[in-house]
Every structure is written in structure tokens, then in C-alpha cells.
Amino acid sequence: LRGQLLLEPSENLDINLSIDYSNRDENCCSSVTIVRGPTAAIIDALAPDSGVAPVADPYARRAWSNRSSAQYIEDNGGSLQIDWNSPWFGGATLTSITALREWSSTNGIDFDYSTADILYRNPEKGDNFTGFETFSQEIRMAGATDNVDWLVGLF
């Protein structure tokens, strides 16, 4: 979901508000066995039925997960850009861009990566295991003369 709103309160001022939101339910990820260590026989004994730890062959692209690998991802953000054609320096444009973004992921992981059900993290919506928030601010002024186009700013 995305939206933008452009306001032009005067011929010298533009204000652009942009927001977005997305969420997805996915299934991701497992790993392949690269090395079968000395505990493989113990893991096999703990596995239900006649489970056997996967063979150490990363090129076979075989992975094992005996629990859900559900993943819930939420991503949203917005920005506000203000452009003002100033009376300074021959009509230079002063621009301010303020932005905020949040991202979070909750995922189920079969941590033992084997046929045994030893270690697992259950994906509960609302439990934020991974995420970030970012804020940014940019201010710049751009203009031109007969011989030079110029730009100065801070981020």
C-alpha cells in the first residue's frame, strides 16, 4: 500500500508527503548440512520414527525442518519533502527531506537443523525478533548561474 500527497500552497512552495506499508506471511529458511559431526548418531536416536540426520552434501540442496518456518514481515515508512524557490542567490531552491522507516520480522526457526525436535523458536505475531527503525534528514540548496550549476547540503 502506497500513497502520495502533493500540496502546492504557492508557486514557490511544494510539499510532498509519501507513505507506504506492507506486510507478508512467508516461509523462509532452512540450511543444508555441510558436515556431519560426532553427535549425529545421538541426534538420530532422538529423532522420531526412524529419522536420520541429513547426509553432509551441500550440493544436494537438502534441508530439514520438522517445524514451521513461518515468517511475518512488516515494513512501513514515510517521507516529507519540502521544496521552496527562495529569493536568495538568483532563486536557488531550498529542499528539506525528512524520512522515517520501520521494519520488523518474526520467524520460526528449527535451530537444530536436524530430524530431531530439539530446539525451536515459535513464530508468534507481535514478538519482534528482528527489526530496525531509521530516521534521516537532508537539507540542501541548489542553484545556477550562467556558468555554474551548484549544490550544497547536509545529510
How would you describe each model-predicted region?
Residues L1-C29, G37, N76-L80, G131-Q137, ...:
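Transmembrane beta-barrel wall of Gram-negative outer-membrane proteins
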Residues P58-N66, I118-K125:
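Extracytoplasmic loops and strand-loop junctions of Gram-negative outer membrane beta-barrel proteins
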